[in-house]
Amino acid sequence: MAASQCLCCSKFLLQRQNLACFLTNPHCGSIINADGHGEVWTDWNNMSKFFQYGWRCTTNENAYSNRTLMGNWNQERYDLRNIVQPKPLPSQFGHYFETTYDTSYNNKMPLSTHRFKREPHCFPGHQPELDPPRYKCTEKSTYMNSYSKS
């Protein structure tokens, strides 16, 4: 006498077969790019998510490095650790490659690397020292609001 499977087990096996079909034939279903760390999400069925990066223990598998500039490349590029890095010294042969446009329009002085002091921040990626002064708000207490001249 053959043992019959319950409905939930047969449904699970069918979903596993669908996932195996998708992995061998990726032209079916849809592929969704995740968050730019080299991860690709496949939206095939309810079971496929458990075998993908975001549902595993770590999400850093096969991730690109920061030099690839994918995902949050703007935040990574303008991070304080990258801005404070000193620029390379000018070459002794640099004047041979200097253009008229550069001499006319790019005459900015190099910025000092010591101008950034770490300010209090509200979350790990927040960098208030990069905000221009007009966007920095000064908090006023109730006392300051009551007794200030303005």
UniProtKB/Swiss-Prot annotation:
One of its GO terms (biological process) is flagellated sperm motility. Residues 99-110 are annotated as: Mn 1. It comes from Macaca fascicularis (Crab-eating macaque). Microtubule inner protein (MIP) part of the dynein-decorated doublet microtubules (DMTs) in cilia axoneme, which is required for motile cilia beating. InterPro entries: CFAP68 (IPR009524), CFAP68/107 (IPR037662). GO terms for cellular component: axonemal A tubule inner sheath; axoneme; cilium; nucleus; sperm flagellum. Keywords: Cell projection, Cilium, Cytoplasm, Cytoskeleton, Flagellum, Nucleus. PANTHER family: CILIA- AND FLAGELLA-ASSOCIATED PROTEIN 107-RELATED (PTHR31180), EXPRESSED SEQUENCE EH456644 (PTHR31180:SF3). Its main location: cytoplasm. This is Cilia- and flagella-associated protein 68. Residues 140-150 are annotated as: Mn 2. It comes from the Eukaryota. Microtubule inner protein component of sperm flagellar doublet microtubules.
